[in-house]
Amino acid sequence: MGNSINLSILIPLIPMGMALFILILLVSFNRTINRLTKPVSFLLVFSLLVSALISSYLYLKKIEGELFLSNYVKVFESKNLALHINSLNEKIIICFTLIISIGIGVLFFKLPRQKGYVTLLIVISLISSSIIFALMFLDFSVLI
């Protein structure tokens, strides 16, 4: 169980990492990346769905607990920041990532894919990963 709970750190980091990777590519190859809207959309949706898959794995295996960030990042050694992993958090994260993935799919089909489209997707992915981090910092089990 200890190793499985360590997977939970990847839930917000996968979409954030993919968005930052595409942002670096956008800055480096601006014209080319703006033309590649289909692969960018696919990669961002795929990263969100992988996060939902990890969340559903943790939910189905009934893995709960806290993951202290001081174990991973030395900056947080003096702080007691912890990611809370419980069934309610996992349900919320699964629903949220699926809704954002569907939203990106709707944007793909409805919006004209012009110059700011890739930037919009990067911003949506960064905001969604920040919200996932915030959801994991909150302990919803005390509300029940």
What are these regions (language model features)?
Residues K115, I124, S141-I144:
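Hydrophobic transmembrane helix module of multi-pass membrane transport proteins
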Residues M1-L13, I24-I122:
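Transmembrane helix-loop-helix hairpins at membrane boundaries of multipass inner-membrane proteins
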Residues L20-I24, S56, G105, S129-M136:
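Alpha-helical transmembrane segments of multipass membrane proteins
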Residues I122-S129:
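Well-ordered mid-protein domain cores that form the structural environment of catalytic cofactors
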Residues S87-L88, S128, L138-D139:
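Short, well-ordered loop/turn elements at secondary-structure boundaries
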Residues L10-P15, K91, F133-I144:
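Hydrophobic alpha-helical membrane segments of integral membrane proteins
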